[in-house]
Amino acid sequence: MMENYKHFTVLLDEAVNGLNIRPDGIYIDGTFGRGGHSRLILSQLGEEGRLLAIDRDPQAIAVAKTIDDPRFSIIHGPFSALGEYVADRDLIGKIDGILLDLGVSSPQLDDAERGFSFMRDGPLDMRMDPTRGQSAAEWLQTAEEADIAWVLKTYGEERFAKRIARAIVEHNREQPMTRTKELAEVVAAATPVKDKFKHPATRTFQAVRIWVNSELEEIEQALKSSLHVLAPGGRLSIISFHSLEDRIVKRFMRENSRGPQVPAGLPMTEEQLKKLGGRQLRALGKLMPGEEEVAENPRARSSVLRIAERTNA
């Protein structure tokens, strides 16, 4: 079924241009998806170039396996483990660029069977990799009311988190929730004030999805690993789709673009300062989609691309 879903790769040219591709370079596409970024990277690599792609979605892996190119390899797993994948291939400090396109993809949203969308009724799953971990339904059926409320507040910034959590728990006591339509209806009924521009279940679905897939922890671990695997001059090109993701990326790039923070007046020798090291990244700014791209693909509206370069420190 997956070939029936049209997929737009957001900020395609901009994200790949941000990598500053060298024909003989080694690159990582940490979120293969349907391969839009990977194919463009491959088109710019020479015979000696290499591209390592990663995805934890089995459907994405199936698409990746159709690419018959000796320069390309695919790994089925989370991008948070990119440090391990690189170490296994003896490529630590040799990666020339890492691209991450965060969040859920259009095919995942559009396929009702994946359970990501409140717009289509399907199994309440939401896992990026349906073969591993707890589904959204399983978690909601076993979680405490306070834990559900915390997730909705923390990852969905939902102001009615406590009311919605109570409604979910009460519904599950009477009849275990298994469908996306059920969750959407329970949330809508528990929301006292409706936003005319946004479905009342939007924040809840985002929060549960982020929790089920440990999305923010995945991002933080991948960013941390990037400092170890990138070569000097190597690039990070990262697309985020909501403020929680972008906040993590922005903070990481800002903190690592500074030198070591030493209290004013603290006596230190030149040798001691050298041991602290210099700044590890140089932030190269951010880009957002133009009006034409947003008109063609409304889901691109909230996307932000941030680019940084590894220093010699």
Swiss-Prot record:
It is found in: Cytoplasm. It holds the Pfam family Methyltransf_5. Transmembrane segments: none annotated. Gene3D superfamilies: Putative methyltransferase TM0872, insert domain, Vaccinia Virus protein VP39. Its EC number is 2.1.1.199. GO terms for biological process: rRNA base methylation. GO terms for cellular component: cytoplasm. InterPro entries: RsmH, SAM-dep_MeTrfase_MraW_recog, SAM-dependent_MTases_sf. It is an enzyme of class 2 (transferase). SUPFAM superfamilies: Putative methyltransferase TM0872, insert domain (SSF81799), S-adenosyl-L-methionine-dependent methyltransferases (SSF53335). Keywords: Cytoplasm, Methyltransferase, rRNA processing, S-adenosyl-L-methionine, Transferase. Its main location: cytoplasm. GO terms for molecular function: rRNA (cytosine-N4-)-methyltransferase activity. S-adenosyl-L-methionine binds at residues 35-37, 55, 79, 101, 108. It catalyses: cytidine(1402) in 16S rRNA + S-adenosyl-L-methionine = N(4)-methylcytidine(1402) in 16S rRNA + S-adenosyl-L-homocysteine + H(+). PANTHER family: 12S RRNA N4-METHYLCYTIDINE METHYLTRANSFERASE (PTHR11265:SF0), S-ADENOSYL-METHYLTRANSFERASE MRAW (PTHR11265). Specifically methylates the N4 position of cytidine in position 1402 (C1402) of 16S rRNA. HAMAP family: 16SrRNA_methyltr_H. NCBIfam families: 16S rRNA (cytosine(1402)-N(4))-methyltransferase RsmH. Belongs to the methyltransferase superfamily. RsmH family. This is Ribosomal RNA small subunit methyltransferase H. It comes from Escherichia coli O6:H1 (strain CFT073 / ATCC 700928 / UPEC).
